Design a protein with these regions (language model features):
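N-terminal alpha-helical interaction blocks
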Residues: 2-91
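Cys/His-clustered metal-coordination modules, chiefly Zn-binding fingers
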Residues: 87-173
Length: 173
């Protein structure tokens, strides 16, 4: 059967990740959820959802699924946080900073798209913040991954160019 066949077996439904199934992502989501709790009163913590891959598996392949950061009801927005195993990467990042960057970015996408609001907000300037490595406050950051500096929520500031690091991810409270 080819992947375009109408006889293709149905995909499994997305499901919440089992405890311990994705330990690095679970640990980093706990950090991000501290910011969710501190900045969105009444918002329950985000969860990890696992959806089956829609692509055919390679011979002897194991489908561990695609991992998304989701609202408590299971809805998510954005890309999966786990690696494409066909490229030979490990399922979870080897370092905590990369995992934190992936999970915090996915959490921001999910919250902003599903709650229709900027998140998180700089209390000084009343604008949405961006995720980036600490100490790169000069201006817009090209998005290069820099695992030597911790991830922070960064504010573009006002029109006078007063951009600044606001807080380490997980410490907005």
């Amino acid at each position: 059967m080819n992947s375009f066949s109408y006889d293709r077996p149905p995909l499994q439904e997305p499901r919440p990740a089992e405890p311990g199934e994705w330990p690095e992502f679970e640990a980093t989501l706990a950090v991000v959820n501290r910011d969710v709790t501190a900045t969105l009163p009444g918002q329950d913590p985000l969860i990890l959802m696992v959806a089956p891959s829609w692509q055919p598996l390679p011979p002897n392949g194991i489908d561990r699924g695609l991992v998304f950061v989701a609202m408590p009801d299971g809805r998510w927005q954005g890309n999966a946080v786990n690696a494409d195993l066909e490229e030979g990467d490990p399922p979870e990042p080897d370092d905590a900073m990369t995992a934190l960057s992936l999970v915090a970015g996915a959490a921001q996408d999910t919250i902003m798209e599903l709650l229709w609001q900027a998140w998180p907000i700089c209390l000084e300037h009343k604008v949405g913040m961006h995720l980036r490595p600490a100490g790169t406050t000069d201006d817009w950051h090209g998005g290069e991954t820099d695992t030597s500096n911790p991830e922070v929520w960064w504010c573009r500031g006002s029109r006078d160019g007063t951009c600044h690091d606001v807080s380490l991810v997980g410490e907005l409270g």
